[in-house]
């Protein structure tokens, strides 16, 4: 692997407008070759998508997805810049795919890391700091281990960080950026709600016993 310097990352950011982590990943994937890293970002749809990310996305559409068996349902708001794009096939296909992703990810609660409340982050930190396998370790090492574990846990709660269900080499964020690059507009997942049949309803023991008995008869 080539030597990935801060200057190399900065040069790639200046050329593409992509985020620092995306630039680092691109350079790592291409062994520090700037031209190949630029091409890698373009193939991922990141280079041009990042330049659009600051533009206002106030149009869009609210989509719904009901999973087979009608036991899980999703409502999701996806925003773009114009009504014309919102009606297009690429946008509508993305809306459906991201809604399906939410249905497949029961632990996801937030769109992005930025949405996670500070008290949730602090709670996760306290849980990790109190784990038995960290006892006796120097404080500095403990902090680094906890930081890594918290980052992993928080990413599990975030929609944009999830591996795309149809192609695990992409994240949902990559998928959105690719669509933004194709249509030439900023696209944002604004919010979503996931419904599970019977969620929050406590079944009594008789209902459960009857279900088991019925299954045995069949």
From Swiss-Prot:
It is found in: Cytoplasm. PROSITE patterns: EF_TS_1, EF_TS_2. InterPro entries: EF-Ts_dimer_sf, Transl_elong_EFTs/EF1B, Transl_elong_EFTs/EF1B_dimer, Transl_elong_Ts_CS, UBA-like_sf. The keyword Hydrolase does not apply. GO terms for cellular component: cytoplasm. Residues 82-85 are annotated as: Involved in Mg(2+) ion dislocation from EF-Tu. SUPFAM superfamilies: Elongation factor Ts (EF-Ts), dimerisation domain, UBA-like. PANTHER family: ELONGATION FACTOR TS, POLYPROTEIN OF EF-TS, CHLOROPLASTIC. Associates with the EF-Tu.GDP complex and induces the exchange of GDP to GTP. It remains bound to the aminoacyl-tRNA.EF-Tu.GTP complex up to the GTP hydrolysis stage on the ribosome. Belongs to the EF-Ts family. This is Elongation factor Ts.
